[in-house]
Amino acid sequence: MKEWQPAIAAHKKNFVVKKNEVIFREGDPVTGIYFVYTGNVKVHKHWGDKELIIRFANNGKILGHRGLGTADATYPISATALEETKLCFIPAEFFISTLKVNHDFAFKLMMFYAAELEESEKKMRNLALMPVKGRLAVALLQLKEQFGLDENQCIAVDMSRQDLAAFAGATYETVFRTMNEMIQENLISLSGKRIAISSEATLTALITS
């Protein structure tokens, strides 16, 4: 991509969004895609009368790609900053033109799409078939894999219980109750807004049982 850096630099726009600031909303016209430099963004959509968090996008992740297509396309999801976040915006027209002539880049994006589709299908299957405790276990293990651990061995992301519930596809009340059960069973422990996994093997067993 080195030969494309001057062209990208001429078209991109870097900016910072504040915590809880909406980057784009479900149904907004597609204007381009976003790359996350630093920070954390929740990608979410309406699911009946609830909010469902599809994934989290932190350093190096991409946003808005699902909306690429025809000129009148709209974003099928929303994106909201969970903390101060630095983004790089690239207009849709330039990005699509780049894909048409850079086959290696297009292939990498296609592989990203395929992996994301597989994760989305797993999430929908879990929502339909898996009990809340299993879905919460999946959510916690995914967060650990994406964000890693801090110096206290907690998952290195500050997250509200409401967002955790939306990521697990459950109500706040159900997740609150299930987390208390997990604490009593020594599966997890809490440190402020952060969660430590005490028994990863047991959480994995909840998913596969």
Residue spans for each PLM region:
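Polybasic "coupling" helices that flank or enter modular domains
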Residues: 100-169
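Residues that scaffold the ATP/ADP-binding catalytic core of kinase and kinase-like folds
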Residues: 44, 65-66, 97-98, 139, ...
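Phosphate-/nucleic-acid-contacting segments
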Residues: 143-209
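Short proline/glycine- and basic residue-enriched helix-capping loop/turn segments at helix->loop/beta transitions
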Residues: 1-19
